[in-house]
Amino acid sequence: MSMVIGIGDLLVGYYWQWRDESQVEGKFMFYRAAKKTTPVKYQYTSNLSRCFLVFGIEPKPNKSGNFNNTMPDTEHSGDTTVNQVETIVTTVVVEQQVPTLVALDSLINENLKLASASQSSGWGFAHGLLVGQLSVVAVLAFFIKFFIFGNSSMARPLMVAPLINRKPAGVYKKGRAKSFSEVEDYDSETSSTQILDKTYYDVKTHQSESLDWFNVLVAQSIAQFRYEALNNDNIYHSLSDALSSSNLPDYLDKITITEINIGDDFPIFSNCRIKHSPNNSNRLEAKIDVDVADTLTLGIETQLLLNQPKPFTAVLPVQLSVSIVRFSACLTVSLISTADEEFQSSIKCVEDSENAIGDYEDDDDEFGGGAALMFSFSPDFRLEFEVKSLIGARSKLENVPLIGNLIEEKLKSWFLERCVEPRFQLIELPSMWPRKKNTRKPVDSESETAVDSN
């Protein structure tokens, strides 16, 4: 780098020296460019301290060392041509360090310019070297200031200021006297804002996502569930046990499963977007469109018993087949803390309302203070059924509309009371901390370890 700077300074110095010398050479070229036949008047003055008049014959100084006595005291002029005075350049007069031009012709006098005779070539080189050094220093200072320190100084306050103003509430130091219960409550509003900022997600302008990758994962899970359900008739035995263990009314006989179809298609999730919850603006929730175009069928048969005036007075065989052929809705999913007051109050409200109706299902689910997955469906859902019925022994009634409408309304009412907003379903999530009891390893690795030990 220093070598490049030195070479640059030398070039600048030589430029200034060449510039001083080129002014004199330019005067020679100017004279030679004049017409050869043009008369040229020359004149000189002698009342100056020192005068050089170049006619090809240099004036000689007198004994006192000056040239004044060799020249007349008055102005002289004469006529000649450029050919005769081609060696005549100009008259450079130095008087009190002020340059003076005595030209040979009025036209030349209007166009010629002389540099100061006191300026030497050595001073021109030194001047150029100094200017070169200063210019290089100025360029380096400009580059360092605006290209190295300029951007960092502007971007630093934007990144550091929030870290200075924010309290490290999640930092734990060993040996502290205060317990975690004394730490400030977690600010959900600040958390949601920071999450959106650090993930570069704008809830107002961000485009919805297709969730193709999520559909593949869900399809794999459903395929595994179907395999386990159909293996050794597991789903048949599970449903039969559930129906037989339930308390049936007196007018129903034992229920037998005649048909099971768990489908062969998969749900499609799409148009996923993150929004603020309308009930709590500090909580984020994902809204996903769900569409299921598949056939899920459950067929049963039973008997209606007429026990009056005595038991089993009359028996009416009934066969039903209910299929879900289409379901589409907007699914709302969010992660919440089960210790939130909003969650606890909503649970209590649901329990009170269901206890008043007498339809409360006590599952003995007690949620702690961990995280839970909350989901619900929008009220404008679409749920289509296909109900087939066959009633009677000898004279049979097939597909009675009244029975189909009754069953469809009952199923939709069951779905509304459990999964449709403002009600929701809650799934408690396991702890994210690794535990020894949850650790697993492949069977092959265990066998290889046993072989190596032997």
From Swiss-Prot:
Compartment list: Endoplasmic reticulum membrane
InterPro entries: Mmm1, MMM1_dom, SMP_LBD
Ranges per topology, Cytoplasmic: 150-454
Domain SMP-LTD, chain residue ranges per copy: 207-430
Pfam families found in the cross-reference section: MMM1 (PF10296)
Record's keyword annotation contains ATP-binding: no
Recorded family membership: Belongs to the MMM1 family.
Free-text note regarding domains: The SMP-LTD domain is a barrel-like domain that can bind various types of glycerophospholipids in its interior and mediate their transfer between two adjacent bilayers.
Protein name per its UniProtKB record: Maintenance of mitochondrial morphology protein 1
Native organism taxonomy: Eukaryota, Fungi, Dikarya, Ascomycota, Saccharomycotina
Gene: MMM1
